[in-house]
Amino acid sequence: DTQNFSIKSDTLDVLNHIELEGSPENTAFRDFQRFMVTQNQKSKAIRDEYDKDPNKDKEEIKKAYTARFEQADKEVRAYIAQMVKKFPHSALATFANFTLSPEIPDFSKTVPENTKDREMEIRRQAYFYSKKHYWDYTNFADSTLIRTPIFKTKLDDYFKNMVMVHPDSLYLSCVEILE
């Protein structure tokens, strides 16, 4: 399949000045990158606001910030879902799906109120769920991602934050990924 397209940009600010012709998938990727920059700025602003809030330890304040973060996450997931629907089975869909982290259920609804160390149990269940589903959106048979910096970043994050640093745990996690 022959495709002709052109790319023009300012090398000092590629993302904001890139012009693409003849490649809807590349145009969608550029738009995705711009959207993610905006979303990351929005999330950082919420995080900064939370960090400076003198009432951040109050439960209702935490819930309000959590709702804002969840809304930002929903916007990203909706954007990616729309893009994947428009470009199914493409490198763009593979890449965009790879950026997603697992949607963790609200375990506070399933852990009984009278559970000893309830908050710890909720976090424990969330951790194990997240670890189990960390690679759900990853197709290891597709070599496209292996050549991207985001793959190394996600792999490093997995072994740094999801796997206990113990030879047996490291071994089992490596086997799970490779299989």
Task: List the predicted regions and their residue ranges.
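Stable alpha-helical elements in mature extracytoplasmic
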Residues: 72-79, 92, 170, 174
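A short structural micro-motif
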Residues: 102-103, 177
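A non-transmembrane, solvent-exposed segment enriched in polar/low-complexity residues
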Residues: 1-87, 106-130, 134-154
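Phospho-regulatory, Ser/Thr- and acidic-rich intrinsically disordered linkers and terminal tails
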Residues: 153, 157-161
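Amphipathic alpha-helical repeat scaffolds of TPR domains
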Residues: 89-102
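A cross-family structural signal marking well-folded subdomains
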Residues: 160-179
